[in-house]
Amino acid sequence: MTKLKNEVTSLESKKTSRRKFFKAAAATGAVAATALAMPNISVAQSAVTLKMQSAWGPADADPFFTMNKQYAQKVEALSGGTLKIEVLPVNAVLKTAEIADGVSTGVVDAGHTVTAYWYGKNPASSLFGTGPSYGFSSQELMGWIEYGGGRALYEETLKATKLDYVGFFAMPMPAQPFGWFKKELKSLADIKGMKYRTVGLATNVLQGIGMTVLQLPGGEIQPAMKTGLIDAAEFNNPSSDRNFGMQDVSKFYSLGSFHQSQEMFEIAFNRKKFESLSKHHQNILRIAAEAANTDNYWYALKRYSDDLNKLVTESGVKAFATPKDILAEQMKSWDKVIADFSAKDALFKKIVDSQKAYAKSVMKYLLLNQPDYSIAFRNTFGDPANVKV
């Protein structure tokens, strides 16, 4: 009898323990469910927001502004909302030429721009975007930065220019058109004495082939051409040009040029602000630039080609290839410009020598290995100049 009583007591004790366990589990589950149902409360309290001055905009009609926002979206997505970037459209706080200094001094936390915009502070800046080709495109130039010693030289250039920020690069831009003219170009003689807009080292290169060059912000190009301040101009791509309304002041669009055959965005962060972030957030800012690098490029190719077709079919623009004698003269002028600057600036020469060494190796492989894709295009569609889309 005593044995049976003890067994009953033991069984009831086990049942009580199980009930306590399930009650505790249910309470824990309720807390977890509540936390899952309200994940944004803690995120919102701990989120860091960086103010980024863009050199582009103010609307999505500007493809570069869209690309800037794509970067910001990737930062927020990768961080789970704990790191955000407020993208400020062009001239919101700083003018385009002021972005580098403004980021360096902390007027804004970050900037989305190109290195050519601080060319006036140091001509070597243009070598990290709008420099000579040596056979490579923007893709290979960015490869040099990350795998050919370019990043250390970029940091050295920032230090020499007294710019205190951390920079990343994104978006390997296609070669820029030679630009908009009052008539179709037939030869080098057609551009002699012409008043032309560009930026960076291209100003020196095109002065060397007989053009008179002015440096103007993007938004001032179309009005300057309309009033006759300049005779011709380039900016960057068919989409930006169409957004500026270049088709309203010119009907002749010269495609293909070595004046700026490669460029990419510089994404700059004030150094103190950057170093105050967690290592996790610092890595996100870097990795987001690498992700935007691909996304921006895919987006650009589709949009640029669509807008070129619209310029031709809807606005009556004649798109034509830049005459070969102009391209040849550009290369000669580049040689002289690079030699002149290298003789005056040891750092400039150091950068050029590094780029040449990288290009000599990498481009030998690519040029020997890559087929001429224009052969395949012509086989399928015909002469690109005559293909209607």
Language-model segments: residues:
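Secretory targeting signals
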Residues: 1-17
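Core domains of carbohydrate- and sulfate-ester-processing enzymes
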Residues: 148-150
